[in-house]
């Protein structure tokens, strides 16, 4: 039996789950997404979200309200008469009136092993913290911030080469599988809810602009995790002395290098091995401002670098 659903999501991460619902034969009668954002040099062009684009490709009615707190928006949502709302990285808080409207409630796919990393940036924070694993969880939403009871979960390892980009892609497809399984148990009346633990609660705050700049006084391991957590977007950056000129460069990939750190910010000759506060790190993929993404060997053929800061 197909369920009548609304879908709420915004970024690329959400799209595989929307596609999975449609491919499974569920009736997605409406999609909610964040409003189009200004883009371009003069920020005059409005760009729809990836979820809005995906919905319009499948001719699904799409709504992009600034808020769901008004009586008008809540009445519009209630008029959909959905069995359940599926929420994946939507970006708006759902008020009680919205949460209580669907027949079976609202179900959220969250990219962490709750209650660890509740909040906006669970993937990035897990990598930054050096967690050895993370996962995907489906929860039935309540009024709290990612505090709902758990329906299903699956964990995956975080390695020293894991980036946010790679992990997001893997978790989104896991989320799609778990959400389809959740709806199957819901249809059969076999849904089991497990309250979250009251221990081990942490919060994944949004990434701040100042966190994107590399502090070479930090240990190499810390910097390596930071680079992986913010790759490819917004990306870590530093200033480099290139041919006697200071340039801002985005660092997209790195690996830990052997050897003892000497002078902080020093670069080994003919390489991109940087001395950190403790240990050394090798930059392997980077991008000059306005330039192409390059591997270190290609970058070094066109640039002489004497220091980073």
Swiss-Prot record:
A GO term from the CC aspect: cytosol
Protein name per the record = Methionyl-tRNA formyltransferase
Q: Which CDD domains match?
A: FMT_core_Met-tRNA-FMT_N (cd08646), Met_tRNA_FMT_C (cd08704)
Q: Which residues form the signal peptide?
A: none
**Family in the record:** Belongs to the Fmt family.
Claim: Ubl conjugation is one of the keywords in the record: no
Q: What is its EC number?
A: 2.1.2.9
Q: Which PROSITE patterns does this chain map to? A: GART
- NCBIfam families linked: fmt
Q: Which GO terms describe its molecular function?
A: methionyl-tRNA formyltransferase activity
The record's listing under InterPro entries reads: Fmt (IPR005794), Formyl_trans_C (IPR005793), Formyl_transf_N (IPR002376), Formyl_transf_N_sf (IPR036477), Formyl_transferase-like_C_sf (IPR011034), GART_AS (IPR001555), Met-tRNA-FMT_C (IPR044135), Met-tRNA-FMT_N (IPR041711)
Catalytic activity field: L-methionyl-tRNA(fMet) + (6R)-10-formyltetrahydrofolate = N-formyl-L-methionyl-tRNA(fMet) + (6S)-5,6,7,8-tetrahydrofolate + H(+)
Query: What job does this protein perform?
Result: Attaches a formyl group to the free amino group of methionyl-tRNA(fMet). The formyl group appears to play a dual role in the initiator identity of N-formylmethionyl-tRNA by promoting its recognition by IF2 and preventing the misappropriation of this tRNA by the elongation apparatus.
Q: Which UniProt keywords apply?
A: Protein biosynthesis, Transferase
Q: Where does (6S)-5,6,7,8-tetrahydrofolate bind?
A: 112-115
